[in-house]
């Protein structure tokens, strides 16, 4: 997967929609559910967005400098992004998914050309500043607004959970720490399954869920949370009524059929 970000477009869109700043991590978190990202490029006059540079660097983006003085009619960032995307399309056949982070309708011809070359195109933009033409041309369009709302809900849930855990802390025995760690692992699995089921119908293979978790959290090891294998983690989720899991007789692995009654 390759990500091309028209930073100024989404930054302005966020500001006009009342968001403090554009958070690229919210976008990457969603994209990592879909596959591995091998190219990340962001285009802007970075002198105008100095405070955003650090976050983009930390997210491993290559920052392409497009001085504002060079803008003449057609946005130079748009042109450079299109050239780089098409170059990658024609030279790197293994990159099969292109993500355009922008709501600009000027990218519609690029989207069409990429799809002509059998590429999947995902758009990401702020709802109020995303062109209907661009949205309709993409195979999928993710609104930043939805990502932001999901992040807020998750933050509230985490704070509520932390408060409950703190209230319980004085009564905890030494074994409680291990139990708490298991809860963290189970929560991560449930979040991942929920995100995957948004894009897929039917069941999920346990191995797929672990692959996505490793993309999101490269340091993840189930043994840290007290599980001998990832399958043990899934079985525990099933026994707690969080997931409905069954063993696949052919592969010997586990299939997740959906959420349990206690999820």
Regions found by a protein language model. Name each.
Residues 1-90, 110-112, 120:
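Domain-level signal for Mg2+-assisted phosphodiester chemistry and nucleotide/NA-binding surfaces
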Residues 43-45, 96-103, 110, 114, ...:
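Acidic beta-strand-to-loop metal/phosphate-binding motif
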Residues 49-53, 126-134:
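Short, glycine/polar-rich helix-capping loops at beta-to-alpha or helix-loop-helix junctions
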Residues 59, 117, 136-138:
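Short, structured coil segments at secondary-structure junctions
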Residues 63, 98, 121, 141-142:
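Short, well-ordered beta-strand core segments
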Residues 124, 154-263:
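N-terminal regulatory modules in eukaryotic regulatory proteins
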Residues 10-11, 70-72, 128-133, 149-151:
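Short gly/pro/ser/thr-enriched loop/turn and capping motifs at secondary-structure boundaries
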Residues 135-136, 140-149, 158-163:
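Conserved phosphate-handling catalytic cores of large alpha/beta enzymes
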């Amino acid at each position: 997967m390759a990500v091309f970000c028209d930073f100024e477009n989404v930054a302005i869109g966020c500001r006009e929609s009342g968001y403090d700043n554009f958070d690229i991590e919210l976008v990457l978190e969603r994209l990592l559910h879909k596959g591995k990202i091998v190219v990340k490029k962001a285009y802007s006059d970075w002198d105008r967005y100095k405070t955003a540079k650090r976050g983009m660097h930390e997210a491993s983006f290559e920052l392409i400098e497009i001085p504002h003085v060079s803008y003449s009619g057609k946005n130079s960032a748009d042109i450079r992004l299109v050239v780089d995307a098409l170059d990658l399309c024609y030279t790197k056949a293994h990159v099969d998914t292109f993500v355009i982070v922008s709501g600009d309708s000027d990218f519609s011809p690029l989207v069409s050309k990429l799809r002509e070359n059998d590429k999947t195109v995902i758009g990401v933009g702020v709802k109020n500043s995303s062109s209907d033409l661009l949205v309709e041309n993409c195979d999928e369009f993710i609104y930043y607004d939805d990502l932001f709302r999901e992040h807020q809900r998750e933050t509230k849930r985490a704070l509520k959970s932390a408060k409950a855990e703190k209230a319980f802390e004085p009564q905890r025995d030494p074994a409680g720490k291990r139990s708490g760690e298991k809860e963290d692992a189970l929560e991560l699995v449930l979040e991942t399954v929920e995100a995957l089921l948004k894009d897929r119908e039917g069941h999920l293979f346990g191995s797929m869920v672990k692959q996505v978790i490793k993309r999101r959290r490269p340091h993840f090891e189930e043994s840290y949370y007290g599980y001998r294998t990832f399958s043990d983690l899934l079985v525990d989720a099933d026994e707690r009524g969080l997931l409905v899991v069954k063993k696949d007789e052919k592969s010997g692995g586990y299939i997740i059929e959906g959420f349990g009654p206690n999820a």
